[in-house]
Amino acid sequence: MACVSDLVAFTQPLIIGAKPLEIVRRSAAFHPNVWGDYFLKLSQDEKKLESMRERAKVLKEKVLKKLSTIEGGERLELIDTLYHLGVAYNFEKEIEEALEKIYKAYDEDATQDNLCTLALRFRLLRQHGWNASSDVFNKFKETKNGNFKESVASDVLGMLSLYEASYVGTKEDKILEEAISFTTRNLSAALPNMEPLLAERVAHSLELPLHKRLQRLEARYFITMYEKNNAHDEMLLEYAKLDYNLLQALHQNEMKELTKWWTKIDLVGKMKFPRDRVTECYFWPLGAFFEPQHSRGRIFATKITQLTSIIDDLYDVYGTQEELQLFTDVIQRWDMNAKKSLPDYIKPLYEALLSTLKDFEEELSLEGNAYRASFMQQAMKNICMAYFDEAKWYNRGTTPKVEEYLNSAEISCGYPVVATACFTGAGEITTKKLLEWIQSQPKYMKDTCRLCRIVDDIKTYKFEEERGHVASVVACYMEEHKCNEDEALEKLNEDVMNTWKDINKACMRPTPFPMVVMNIIRNLSRVMEILYQFGDGYTFADTVTKERLNLLLKDPIPV
């Protein structure tokens, strides 16, 4: 981490006689790339992978048969297990049909179920956009005082199921707000007396609820936990391990391609100052959509995310006001000839951005989708304008009002760029109407961006204040409301909770686009919760983030 002595403010170039004084620039002293050429050296046994694919096909048919022959609570549990194991994406059609049938019988079944099954049904339906009523939980409350019954506190599995279900709620689900408080308090109190396997599972959930976790990381964790359970299904376990490792092999190949691209353009070598984080940039699109059919989308989105990260560092740390004005202007022109007006050290970045998008536009044109590139261009123009506005705030010493700051953050957080990049590279799920919708910044996108910025700022504001940075949302809130840091953090964390409820509400059917689209965008919120869970896991990528990426991209599961 950079210390205060590493950081110095901008000074404008001064002319004394005929010699200009050297410009003094800020530096964040970012640590180097922790992956090096690992993926370039990685080799795979294709014969072994093909054998794994054949075995996985056989097991998939067995899972399909099992899914079609069971009913009721047993089917609910199987669907939930498939999600935890990370293989539900292989059975989307069958699960959708099953949940539609379950939704139609929701009210009738709710009168008969125990808390564990009822909460599981509610959560699965809400996760898939079905507006299951939370009123079904009223039967677990006392009629006199409205509190949850004492018997609920002694039902650990029921409480755990209710706890997880509570996070798919909206602002209208007041009972779920009470449930979060009730279950968190009672599960925490009961934790020391639980058997080890259950205690580990409960502690994992209390650390971060399932609804905020990423499927691939959750699958890696759950496969290990599932194997420890003596009641596990050996066929399901083997299938989950094979599927995880096969996907990991695909993701490794994508990272090999990305590392080749990144090494070839060598922007860090040419520019020296930015964060070298191409593997960490891959974390965002991998979190958004990990399935095989989205391979191209992940590759393109990672390239754009890494280039945007360098642009962010240029505006945040390194560039002078005059240089940033020039760069903002040439980005708006989007013309390779315009690079002549840029300082030499910025030219490689401009060239790489325009060339990367041009190459992709040519690829898209072969399938009649060249129009997508114009949306990507506009997203880049928009974010550079937002970055420049915030750089002006910093240089003027301005602390904006909270909503003014968050309005800018709807663009500068980077999620409109990342989402546009994901869908620009995606397959048939992308339409012109979808890209127009994202560009128009509907409330769903604004909420996702709001959550992104607040979560980011809560975890990074102290370091950025030391480095020299535009005022964070924490500083803006303290200034506007004349409160202390703890009060500001309490209110902002409450804002995050409420924004999650709005995001959940937006994913209720009918939705403006298919659930697969809505979930890709919602997954970007989950990436923030994970990547910034213990601090800035992107800038400081050599600890927890490295461990998580090892699980995702390096270490296969023993089969």
Curated annotation (Swiss-Prot):
Upper lineage: Eukaryota, Viridiplantae, Streptophyta, Embryophyta, Tracheophyta
Tissue specificity field: Mostly expressed in stems and, to a lower extent, in leaves, roots and fruits.
Name of this chain's protein: Terpene synthase 1
Protein species of origin: Piper nigrum
Binding positions (Mg(2+) 1): 312, 316
Enzyme Commission code: 4.2.3.104, 4.2.3.57
Free-text note regarding domains: The Asp-Asp-Xaa-Xaa-Asp/Glu (DDXXD/E) motif is important for the catalytic activity, presumably through binding to Mg(2+).
Keywords: Lyase, Magnesium, Metal-binding
Pathway listed: Secondary metabolite biosynthesis; terpenoid biosynthesis
GO MF: alpha-humulene synthase activity; magnesium ion binding; terpene synthase activity
Protein family (similarity comment): Belongs to the terpene synthase family. Tpsa subfamily.
